[in-house]
């Protein structure tokens, strides 16, 4: 059946991809070489809530009644809240830009610092644990946000199980997180806060960085592409798809671009595994 109507519950995984803050790849995920940059998986995700704010309704009132109503976009911030069953010093340090230090056999992380407000921007992939279409067949629902800033909240010590919360600010971008440029001709919009992806296999995203030499770019060994036809590679700067060949039609692991990527060429691959 067509990928359209579905329902589901729970979270399978949340993956964060820190973004380049300067240079030609500013706003792209921080890949480093021809090996797949997989981002950082958030441990123990429990729930995620999006909030795009309520639309404004403005009535035309005269003679004691409403004659017409105009609905306009919300002026509230687009945000989210991620809750997890684990806390991670490494993840908190990554997001806030502070350092973990070792003192004796202990690790120490500063919190509530003078760097508040300087948290890094990430792309974010959020995947549902179980989704079925309207015929009961298994499928996958994934949200991909190109601009997300996560602020870790301190955990409380009570008789309840630990709950770690991250408050998230979401921003619009002119391209999807994998680099595809949004255009009126193709998407009928030029900016978006997130992409909602429906797929038969598990959707994934990885990044590669060219160096004028590397010609083979690899996927994670534990996450090969189900089929090469499910994989698309994008150049982040041009916003266009990259031509090339895969080493196999099923369980593909290696992509060879038609043209060897230049130094600092940021390639992003989206595929199903």
Question: Which ranges hold each PLM region?
Answer:
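Polar/acidic, low-complexity leader/linker segments enriched in S/T/G and N/D
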Residues: 1-50
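Extended beta-strand solenoid/passenger and fiber regions
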Residues: 189-248, 254-255, 260-273
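Surface-exposed ligand/attachment interfaces on beta-rich extracellular proteins
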Residues: 60-68, 107-112, 157-158, 208-224, ...
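Extracellular-facing segments of soluble proteins and assemblies that are Gly/Ser/Thr-biased and enriched
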Residues: 70-135
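Oligomerization/assembly interface segments of phage tail-like spikes and tubes
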Residues: 58-93, 97, 159-175
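Exposed beta-sheet edge/beta-hairpin loop segments within beta-rich domains
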Residues: 71-74, 111-116, 153-163, 259-260
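Mixed-charge, glycine-accented linear interaction segment located at domain edges/termini
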Residues: 144-205, 272-273
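Short N-terminal edge-element motif at the start of the domain
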Residues: 29-63, 94-116
């Amino acid at each position: 059946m067509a990928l359209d109507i579905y329902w589901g519950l729970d979270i399978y995984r949340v993956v964060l991809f820190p973004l380049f803050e300067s240079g030609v790849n500013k706003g792209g995920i921080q890949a480093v070489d021809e090996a797949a940059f997989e981002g950082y998986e958030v441990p123990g995700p429990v729930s995620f809530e999006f909030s795009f704010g309520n639309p404004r309704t403005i009535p035309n009132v005269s003679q004691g009644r409403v004659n017409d109503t105009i609905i306009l976009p919300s002026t509230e911030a687009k945000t989210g809240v991620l809750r997890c069953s684990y806390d991670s010093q490494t993840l908190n340090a990554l997001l806030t830009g502070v350092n973990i230090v070792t003192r004796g056999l202990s690790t120490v992380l500063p919190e509530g610092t003078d760097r508040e407000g300087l948290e890094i921007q990430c792309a974010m992939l959020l995947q549902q644990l179980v989704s079925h279409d309207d015929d009961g067949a298994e499928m996958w629902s994934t949200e991909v946000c190109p601009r997300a800033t996560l602020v870790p909240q301190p955990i409380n010590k009570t008789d309840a199980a630990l709950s770690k919360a991250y408050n998230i600010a979401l921003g619009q971008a002119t391209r999807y997180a994998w680099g595809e440029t949004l255009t009126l001709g193709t998407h009928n919009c030029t900016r978006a806060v997130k992409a909602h992806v429906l797929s038969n296999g598990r959707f994934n995203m990885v990044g590669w960085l060219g160096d004028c030499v590397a010609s083979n770019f690899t996927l994670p060994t534990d996450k090969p592409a189900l089929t090469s036809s499910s994989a698309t590679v994008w150049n982040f700067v041009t916003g266009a798809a990259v031509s090339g060949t895969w080493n196999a039609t099923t369980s593909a692991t290696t992509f060879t671009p038609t043209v060897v990527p230049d130094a600092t060429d940021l390639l992003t691959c989206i595929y199903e595994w």
